[in-house]
Amino acid sequence: MLRYLTAGESHGPALVSVVEGVPAGLPLTAEYINRQLGRRQRGYGRGARMKIEGDAVKFLSGLRDGLTLGSPIALLVENKDWANWSEIMSTHPGARTDEKAVTRPRPGHADLAGAIKYRHADLRNVLERSSARETAARVAAGSVARRLLEELGIRIIGQVISVGGVEAGPLSLAPEELEARLEKSELFCADQAAERRMMAAIDSAREAGDTVGGVFEIRAYGVPPGLGSYVQWDRRLDGRLAAALMSIQAVKGVEVGMGFAAARKTGSQVQDEIFYEQGRGFYRRTNRAGGMEGGVSNGEPLVLRAAMKPIPTLRRPLQSVDLITKEPSSAAVERSDVCAVPAACVIGEAAVAWELAGACLEKCGGDSLAELKDNWDRYLSYVRQV
């Protein structure tokens, strides 16, 4: 069983991920994970903290000589900004908790609900953990899963398709061409004309002291039919992937394939007809289902989209109420981004990679990479013969 936990506060000394269930013998390097961490920090519209943090992972356990051991993998990402917060965020009694205390909850954040739930008088005790800074640890864990998927021939590509109401046009690009174009983009958007308009929307929001959201799309190529299951609700692959994407901070909606547009169509306009060709097997000429039917992958590329709301921390804060005095007040202002949709896209890739890797291990198992690949190859051979 593949699982992970993260720990750490936004301005604490570090973030930690503990990953369990990775087969032994998987080649893995810090450089590989650091590349994904670096992609998470990119993106037009990011805030000042991205200039402070240069995220890099340290392996504390689970590897030797560049190979996984099959034991839990502990990954640490240091917070460079800790030097400025060490006394305020100290774990020892006597921390200067009176400094930079937050008592004015921000609409749209976990501040007020978290304070009520955990009985905190200082909202910093909530926002330090609910912060999207935690996603650096998630990307580190998801990168391990992504590396495993590469060994099985599965490729994950994310792209931003909407920012601030500006929509990218549909493009028919091969995965290699799409990936190359996205790496050159400041917003991970393949439509260059739309990207320029998106950047203008971000600039306008920045000047107005506001923020913008958007939509990102994740595609997974090379996924065979048969991952996931229809026999129980919690084993349905589309449900697991949707939950993983919904767990990302500020994501408010997820769709698969046609998604919500399917509700406005007739059945004959939505389903993907089935064809068969000798040497190719079963295939579809359309992929409106997004690569999954009945909670099971069907052999077509997986296609998911997630909608991210505008970041709720605003330089021109909204109305709030002081937690202590109960007096009307403007919401607190913390350092933040104008747009973090590109970062959310990278986090989405990690989330999808994690769930897919888990589904692959459930299907074919293996305590070592060699055993997993043997089982995987036998299954693919069977699929080709059906």
Curated annotation (Swiss-Prot):
Its cofactor is FMNH2. Pathway: Metabolic intermediate biosynthesis; chorismate biosynthesis; chorismate from D-erythrose 4-phosphate and phosphoenolpyruvate: step 7/7. Keywords: Amino-acid biosynthesis, Aromatic amino acid biosynthesis, FAD, Flavoprotein, FMN, Lyase, NADP. InterPro entries: Chorismate_synth, Chorismate_synth_AroC_sf, Chorismate_synthase_CS. NADP(+) binds at R40, R46. Its EC number is 4.2.3.5. Reduced FMN (FMNH(2)). It catalyses: 5-O-(1-carboxyvinyl)-3-phosphoshikimate = chorismate + phosphate. This is Chorismate synthase.
